[in-house]
Curated annotation (Swiss-Prot):
Annotated family: Belongs to the RimM family.
One Pfam family hit: RimM
Keywords, comma-separated and alphabetical: Chaperone, Cytoplasm, Ribosome biogenesis, rRNA processing
Function in brief: An accessory protein needed during the final step in the assembly of 30S ribosomal subunit, possibly for assembly of the head region. Essential for efficient processing of 16S rRNA. May be needed both before and after RbfA during the maturation of 16S rRNA. It has affinity for free ribosomal 30S subunits but not for 70S ribosomes.
Domain notes: The PRC barrel domain binds ribosomal protein uS19.
Quaternary structure and partners: Binds ribosomal protein uS19.
Database matches in SUPFAM superfamilies: PRC-barrel domain (SSF50346), Translation proteins (SSF50447)
InterPro entries noted in UniProt: PRC_barrel-like_sf, PRC_RimM, RimM, RimM_N, RimM_N_sf, Transl_B-barrel_sf
Chief place of localization: cytoplasm
Record protein name field: Ribosome maturation factor RimM
Length: 169
């Protein structure tokens, strides 16, 4: 049985000659990122998640860096650039009613109350005021605010969201 993982960070360019790498959180805060237990890594050329052992996460001002145990020079570190850091999905805190992790919304089919299809959710834009679902159907793209006012129902097990929205909004 394969385990589901949620991406929590992305490794960026090398930072120091000893193999430190920039670390970019995908979580809402650095504290949230650091609160997760065991981390896993997915290399750019490999879809398998591997456990990270003895990594060090360094915080300098408002930036994060990662030092992998087996990496001691820039050339070795370059192999890890653009890798993803993840945690098992079951390690995430349970969400409350009317809440969902963004990762659970990606891939959901979107239809309106008239059963017109808006395709699938391919991304989410955070605007500050609210989130916006980016939906794609064929070559068309639709932006639908992810707010209670427009969400009629959500079944994440069936990957289906019904919205009170029209094509011409």
């Amino acid at each position: 049985m394969s385990q589901d993982f949620v991406e929590i960070a992305k490794i960026g360019a090398t930072y120091k000659l000893d193999g430190e790498l920039n670390l970019y959180p995908l979580a809402s805060s650095i504290e949230t990122l650091l609160s997760y237990g065991d981390w896993y890594i997915q290399l750019p050329a490999n879809s398998a998640w591997q456990p990270l052992k003895d990594e060090s996460v360094l915080r300098r001002a408002d930036k994060l860096y990662i030092k992998l145990a087996s990496v001691n020079d820039v050339e070795t570190a370059k192999k890890y650039v653009n890798s993803l850091i993840g945690v098992p999905k079951e390690a995430l805190p349970k969400v409350g009613n009317d809440e969902a992790y963004f990762t659970d919304l990606i891939g959901c089919t979107i239809v309106n109350t008239a059963n017109d299809s808006f395709g699938k959710v391919i991304g989410i834009i955070e605007t500050g005021a609210n989130e916006v679902l980016v939906c794609k159907k064929d070559s068309d793209e639709y932006l639908i605010p992810y707010v209670k006012q427009y969400i009629v129902s959500e079944d994440l097990d069936l990957k289906k969201i019904v919205v009170d929205w029209e094509y011409d909004y």
